[in-house]
């Protein structure tokens, strides 16, 4: 019966929300800094025979043959953190302010189904989950390597996943995000996080976590990166750069991403330092990992799965590990994105830092990131006034989840 239900769900999903076809097969695909050249459909001897009747491939066949297999393998190895249910309750804050900050649906669910606290983040945790996905894939690059694919280094993979288990003791659990959000960002349990609060929580939790050690540089809700401030965060006692996650909270327009920033936004996912983008959908956050032409590929956290136990030894079952990945492609046109987002880059050493700055400065179009020697530099350079007209600093008062 269960198998029949799953089959029915897949059939309904196919017609209601079909997977995208590669309708720009001549364009390369990028996934977190890796380029996948256009794939060539298999040759058909009948196509060279004028006497043979023409055959039109069906949608399923076209979809199977036109996405590069290497890209599908890479996409399917990106860690996907979604809504979870039945985890250890997150206590509710019983104040009028906390209650009013929740949506009606979350308020009713918490009162009727979770009177002792939140045992699921469905309806309010998608920005946290997108931020967790960005951070988890940052650790994947650091600990497993950018060339890692599923089926390799299973023990190390499991230990990485355990850090994001839905339990108060896990270093990067939703429980700890919510606690830090309440302490440092004024976010109540059950309240939507925005990119700014999520970035701040990532920074605080990374600072408190000794293994693996990761430094985090925040731009404090602007698109400006200051080299002296970055050095203060990234340099060790010997003056060498340690692995540092740069988180840029920005707004690239008013209601939609301004076309002048399309090139810069696409390019951000082609840099080898890219670890993705969190946010970017009206009233819903996603985790963007790839780009092709004017479309971005993303992982959608709006699927509720059973919570995983915290196992520091990393002994997870295959089924539990599988719940952190998906092979289902999703994409969106840049014009349909929400302009508020959190953009992440991982700089591992001096060469990475020099290469990243060079790429930022040479990207065509209106820049989405500005690099300056110092915050106290009196003149931010030509074009700064125009940039301020379009790129707005994030304000949690109008952030989306």
Swiss-Prot record:
It catalyses: [protein]-C-terminal L-amino acid-glycyl-phosphatidylethanolamide + H2O = [protein]-C-terminal L-amino acid-glycine + a 1,2-diacyl-sn-glycero-3-phosphoethanolamine. InterPro entries: Papain-like_cys_pep_sf, Peptidase_C54, Peptidase_C54_cat. It holds the Pfam family Peptidase_C54. GO terms for biological process: aggrephagy; autophagosome assembly; mitophagy; piecemeal microautophagy of the nucleus; protein processing; protein transport. Its EC number is 3.4.22.-. GO terms for molecular function: cysteine-type endopeptidase activity; protein-phosphatidylethanolamide deconjugating activity. The keyword Cytoplasm applies. It is an enzyme of class 3 (hydrolase). The keyword Lipid biosynthesis does not apply. Residues 45-65 have a biased composition (Polar residues). The active site is at residues 126, 300, 302. Keywords: Autophagy, Cytoplasm, Hydrolase, Nucleus, Protease, Protein transport, Thiol protease, Transport. Residues 37-65 are annotated as: Disordered. It is found in: Cytoplasm; Nucleus; Preautophagosomal structure. GO terms for cellular component: nucleus; phagophore assembly site. Belongs to the peptidase C54 family. Cysteine protease that plays a key role in cytoplasm to vacuole transport (Cvt) and autophagy by mediating both proteolytic activation and delipidation of ATG8. Required for selective autophagic degradation of the nucleus (nucleophagy) as well as for mitophagy which contributes to regulate mitochondrial quantity and quality by eliminating the mitochondria to a basal level to fulfill cellular energy requirements and preventing excess ROS production. The protease activity is required for proteolytic activation of ATG8: cleaves the C-terminal amino acid of ATG8 to reveal a C-terminal glycine. This is Probable cysteine protease atg4. It comes from Penicillium rubens (strain ATCC 28089 / DSM 1075 / NRRL 1951 / Wisconsin 54-1255) (Penicillium chrysogenum).
């Amino acid at each position: 019966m269960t198998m029949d239900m799953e089959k029915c769900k897949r059939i309904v999903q196919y017609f209601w929300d079909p997977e995208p076809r590669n309708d720009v097969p001549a364009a390369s695909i990028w996934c977190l800094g890796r380029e996948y050249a256009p794939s060539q459909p298999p040759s058909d001897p009948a196509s060279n025979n004028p006497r043979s009747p023409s055959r039109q491939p069906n949608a399923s066949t076209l979809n199977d043959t036109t996405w590069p297999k290497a890209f599908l393998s890479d996409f399917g190895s990106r860690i996907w953190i979604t809504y979870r249910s039945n985890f250890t309750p997150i206590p509710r804050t019983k104040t009028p302010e906390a209650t009013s900050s929740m949506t009606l649906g979350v308020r009713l669910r918490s009162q009727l189904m979770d009177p002792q606290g939140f045992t699921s983040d469905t309806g309010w945790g998608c920005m946290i989950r997108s931020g967790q996905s960005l951070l988890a894939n940052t650790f994947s690059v650091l600990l497993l390597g950018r060339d890692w694919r599923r089926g390799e280094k299973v023990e190390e993979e499991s230990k990485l996943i355990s850090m994001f288990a839905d339990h108060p003791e896990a270093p990067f659990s939703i429980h700890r995000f919510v606690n830090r959000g309440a302490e440092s960002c004024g976010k109540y349990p059950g309240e939507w996080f925005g990119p700014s609060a999520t970035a701040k929580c990532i920074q605080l939790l990374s600072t408190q976590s000794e293994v693996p050690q990761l430094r985090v540089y925040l731009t404090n809700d602007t698109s400006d990166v200051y080299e002296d401030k970055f050095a203060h965060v990234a340099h060790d006692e010997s003056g060498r750069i340690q692995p540092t996650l740069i988180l840029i909270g920005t707004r690239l327009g008013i209601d939609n991403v301004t076309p002048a920033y399309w090139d810069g936004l696409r390019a951000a996912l082609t840099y080898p330092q890219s670890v993705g983008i969190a946010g970017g959908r009206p009233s819903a956050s996603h985790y963007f990992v790839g780009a092709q032409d004017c479309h971005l590929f993303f992982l959608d956290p709006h699927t509720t799965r059973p919570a995983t136990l915290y196992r520091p030894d990393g002994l997870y079952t295959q089924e539990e590990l599988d719940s952190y990945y998906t092979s289902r492609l999703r994409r969106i046109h840049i014009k349909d994105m929400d302009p508020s987002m959190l953009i992440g880059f991982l700089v591992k050493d001096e060469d990475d830092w020099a290469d990243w700055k060079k790429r930022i400065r040479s990207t065509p179009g209106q820049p989405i990131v500005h690099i300056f020697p110092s915050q106290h530099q009196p003149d931010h350079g030509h074009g700064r006034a125009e940039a301020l007209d379009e790129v707005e600093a994030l304000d949690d008062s109008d952030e989306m989840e």
